[in-house]
Structure formats: C-alpha cells, structure tokens
C-alpha cells in the first residue's frame, strides 16, 4: 500500500504547472507548446507509473486513498481514491489530453491562455474521476464549465458566442439539479452534513426521496452525456469549437456524464436505478435511432459527426440500464472506445476543414486524391465508428447487445423489440457515415477551385492518428485488455441489486 499522495499530485500538477505558462516569454509560441506537451507527458507518465506499481488490478475496492481536512467548519474533506471503474477513464483522459495539446499546435492567438485552459480542464477531469467526496465531485464537475466556455467563445467559429452561451446555459442549468441532489443527499438523516461516498453507499432513503434524488442527478448527467432531449447544445458546440477542443469534448467530457450515472446514480441509489432502468433502456434505443436519422439529414459534416456521437451514447445508456455484468462492462468498453474514435473523427474533420475552409457536404468532393492520408485515416476511423469487426466499436456494441439479451430484468418481447431497434440503428450508422465519405472524398468538384490549400497530413498529424489507431485495433482484437480492469468491480457493484 502506497501512502504517497499520487492522486493529489495528478490533480494539482496540470493546473499549477499551467499557471506558470503566463511567466514564459511572450515572443513566439514554440516554448509554450513544448512546455504544455512536456507537462501532459509528465502527467501521463506519472499516472502510468502510479497505476502500474501501486494499484492492484485484482482488488475491486478503492485504492490509493487520500483523506485530508479541507473546509474544517463544515467538516468537508479532500477525499480521493480510485477503483477499476475510474482507472480506465483516468488513463483515457491522460492519453486524449496529451494528444489534444499536440493537435492544438497551429493555435497561435493567445496561445498561453489557450494551453492554460486545456491544462485546467485536465485537472478537473482527473479530479472528477478520482473524487471520493460528493462535494469534491461537484466542484470538479463545475471546474470544466469555465475553461470550455472560454475555449469555445475565444477560439471557435463564426457562431462561437451562440454555441458557447448555449453550452453554458444547458450545463449550468443541469448543475443546479446536481447541487440540489448533493445537498439533499448530504443533509438527509443527519445533523452533520456528510458527503463521503463510502458512507453514502450504505445510506438508505425512502423510495420517494430516492427517486427525487435520482431524477435530479439524472438531469445533470443527461446534459453532459447527452441524453435526448437535452442534447441540442452538442451539435452547435462541435460545429464551432476548435478541433483540439472537440477532442476533449467528445473524448472525455461526454464520458463524465456516463461515469456520474454509474458512480452516483447506480452505486448510491440502487433502488431508484432499478425502477428507472427500463426507461433508460427505452431512451437509449430511441436515442440511437433518432440521432442516427438526424445525422443523415445534416449538411454540415461536423454536425453529422456530432449526432453520430449522440447515437453512440445510446449504447452506453442501454448498457447501464441493463443491470447485468455483461451490459455494464459493455457500457464501460463503449465509453473508452468512443473516447478514442469520437475524438479522432473530430480531429480529422477539423484538419480537413482547415485545409478546405468548407463544412457543407454539397460543396465538397474529390479530396481523396490531393489528401490521400486524411482520406485513409478518415475512412479507417469511420469503419471503427460503424462497428467494423476487429475494431473496438464492434466489440463494445456486441457486448451491450449480449448484456441486454441476458438481462433478467426484462421480459422476452421487450428485449426483442429493443434489440430490433438497436439493430436498425446499427444499419443507419454506415448509411450516414459512408454517404459522408462519398460526398467529401469522391468526385471531382474541388479540383478546379482556386486558392485551396490541398496539403495532406504531416508527420505530427500522422503520429497522433497512429497513436489512437493502435488502441482501437488492440481493443477490437483483444477486448480483455479493458474488460479485465472492470469485471470484478462491476460484479461487486451489481451485488447490491441481487441482494436487495
């Protein structure tokens, strides 16, 4: 057992080191870029070392615990700890954030502030996934809002202020329900407020109160995940944000909602989750069909990919609602799989948009010949997104299918109906993705357009793409790389449902 404060260092290092960016020389961006990359690499290497040498994979309980007095007046503590459920999300955060800083290389305007905001997001994300106190969880949840709002409003597209305002209104509105739930859970049945997750796991509530708490938390997670109809901020945000910001949004920010749904709603409120689970499965199935159908009608290819993300989140919702070992492990696998695939698709869309200065599909065509590397990688990750066998997306969706089919919670006919709806969604996915590829990369439309910078991917971009492609293939061929991390913890979590 390690008593060294590994998690505190991992949470504090990015934002503390990021604040030193403003003391670096103002002339040129090279020093700021390399400094930020070095901080992200150091953070990723530190977390890899800590987890390899101080984390026991076979132990499903909380490890690397830290507990320090924080606000003495209210007896609030700085409580950190990780288990196999949070391990994958933390490693995904380190991996994607490091590559997102590399993707942000072309940013030159106010680069010091830009990279500081990315590092502040990094701290908030690591803090959220390692929090063992509900108040600390909420603070880390809110810490994301300001950096994302500034990244959107200062480095976005023409409608960046509209998309940033929509993002902040939706997420802040959801956070109000989150805060009410935190206060209600902490103050219930006790003269002294206590928000330690270890204590709250053993806390029981009246059925009506538990349902109200569950619904409040669900609204907050439904905004971030997102769950229809609270998803409308996402297409605008992804359509206007810089592609490095999109990588963080699609790769990590959306997964915070899924993680919260498992960590708080499922773990702390099992009775309410058991009652709500059929509705989650229905909403997930409807979301797969709705978002896939809406994606097919989008003229802007960035928004088409954004609706694709909403559709794939439906599989995570179904996996969480299935209340089975297989289904929940499939949801966790889909969280990591879409983190890789979604982030890369937005990176490729952004790099293509930077070169063509066009986003509408009817204006595109014929760019596969001048940009063959972008075409190859875009096609490869589109195949991963549409669940081609041998890639991570296929395994994740297949495991969720099996989880739903084997669920004792549902009768045969509802399971058949939901499975049929999911299958239709999987058919729609290649339709909207392959039609996008055809409109963008085939034909001859752009060959005679003057003043277009048809430059293919350089070494930096290829390195980034290959780094993400390797785990996508690795998980697709050998999914036990991920499943072995979570299977024991999932079994312990679901024991609440079978014993109660």
Swiss-Prot record:
Keywords: Chloroplast, Membrane, NAD, NADP, Plastid, Plastoquinone, Quinone, Thylakoid, Translocase, Transmembrane, Transmembrane helix. It comes from the Eukaryota. Its main location: plastid. One of its GO terms (cellular component) is chloroplast thylakoid membrane. The chain crosses the membrane at residues 4-24, 35-55, 87-107, 111-131, 134-154, 167-187, 211-231, 242-262, 272-292, 313-333, 334-354, 386-406, 417-437, 462-482. GO terms for biological process: aerobic respiration; ATP synthesis coupled electron transport; electron transport coupled proton transport. It catalyses: a plastoquinone + NADH + (n+1) H(+)(in) = a plastoquinol + NAD(+) + n H(+)(out); a plastoquinone + NADPH + (n+1) H(+)(in) = a plastoquinol + NADP(+) + n H(+)(out). GO terms for molecular function: NADH dehydrogenase (ubiquinone) activity; ubiquinone binding. It is a multi-pass membrane protein. It is an enzyme of class 7 (translocase). It holds the Pfam family Proton_antipo_M. It is found in: Plastid, Chloroplast thylakoid membrane. InterPro entries: NADH_Q_OxRdtase_chain4, NADH_Q_OxRdtase_chainM/4, NADH_UbQ_OxRdtase, ND/Mrp_TM. Its EC number is 7.1.1.-. Belongs to the complex I subunit 4 family. This is NAD(P)H-quinone oxidoreductase chain 4, chloroplastic. It comes from Zea mays.
């Amino acid at each position: 057992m390690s008593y060294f404060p590994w998690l505190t260092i991992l949470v504090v290092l990015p934002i503390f080191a990021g604040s030193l960016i403003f003391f670096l020389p103002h002339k040129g961006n090279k020093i700021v870029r390399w400094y930020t990359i070095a901080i992200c690499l150091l953070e990723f290497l530190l977390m890899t070392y800590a987890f390899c040498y101080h984390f026991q994979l076979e132990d499903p309980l909380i490890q690397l615990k830290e507990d320090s007095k924080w606000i003495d007046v209210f007896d609030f503590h700085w409580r950190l700890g990780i288990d196999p459920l949070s391990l994958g999300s933390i490693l995904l955060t380190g991996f994607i954030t490091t590559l997102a800083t590399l993707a942000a290389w072309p940013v030159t305007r106010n680069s010091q502030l830009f990279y500081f905001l990315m590092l502040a997001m990094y701290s908030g994300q690591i803090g959220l996934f390692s929090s063992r106190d509900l108040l600390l969880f909420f603070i880390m949840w809110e810490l994301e809002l300001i950096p994302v709002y500034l990244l959107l409003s200062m480095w976005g597209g023409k409608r960046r202020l509209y998309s940033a305002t929509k993002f902040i209104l939706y997420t802040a509105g959801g956070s109000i329900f989150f805060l009410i739930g935190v206060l209600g859970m902490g103050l219930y049945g006790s003269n002294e407020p206590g928000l330690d997750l270890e204590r709250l796991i053993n806390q029981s509530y009246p059925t009506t109160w538990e349902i109200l708490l569950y619904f409040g938390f669900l609204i907050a997670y439904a905004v971030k995940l997102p769950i229809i109809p609270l998803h409308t901020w996402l297409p605008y945000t992804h359509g206007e944000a810089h592609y490095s910001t999109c990588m963080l949004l699609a790769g990590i920010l959306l997964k915070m909602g899924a993680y919260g749904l498992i960590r708080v709603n499922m773990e702390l409120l099992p009775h309410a989750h058991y009652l709500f689970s059929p509705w989650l499965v229905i909403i997930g199935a409807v979301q797969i069909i709705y978002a896939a159908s809406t994606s097919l009608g989008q003229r802007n290819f960035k928004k088409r990919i954004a609706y694709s993300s909403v559709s794939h989140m439906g599989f995570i919702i179904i996996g969480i609602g299935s209340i089975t070992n297989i289904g929940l492990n499939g949801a966790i696998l889909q969280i990591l799989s879409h983190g890789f695939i979604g982030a890369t698709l937005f990176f490729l869309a952004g790099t293509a948009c930077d070169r063509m200065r066009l986003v509408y599909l009817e204006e595109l065509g014929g760019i596969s010949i001048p940009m063959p590397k972008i075409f190859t990688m875009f096609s490869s990750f589109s195949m991963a997104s549409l669940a081609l066998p041998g890639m991570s997306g296929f395994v994740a969706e297949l495991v969720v299918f099996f989880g739903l089919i084997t669920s004792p919670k549902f009768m045969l006919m509802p399971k058949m109906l939901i499975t049929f709806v999911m299958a239709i969604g999987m058919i729609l996915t290649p339709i909207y993705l392959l039609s996008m590829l055809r409109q963008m990369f085939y034909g001859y439309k752009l060959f005679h357009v003057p003043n277009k910078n048809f430059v293919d991917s350089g070494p930096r971009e290829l390195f980034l793409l290959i780094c993400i492609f390797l785990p996508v293939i690795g998980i697709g061929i050998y999914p036990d790389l991920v499943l072995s991390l979570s299977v024991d913890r999932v079994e312990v979590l679901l024991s609440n449902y079978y014993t109660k």
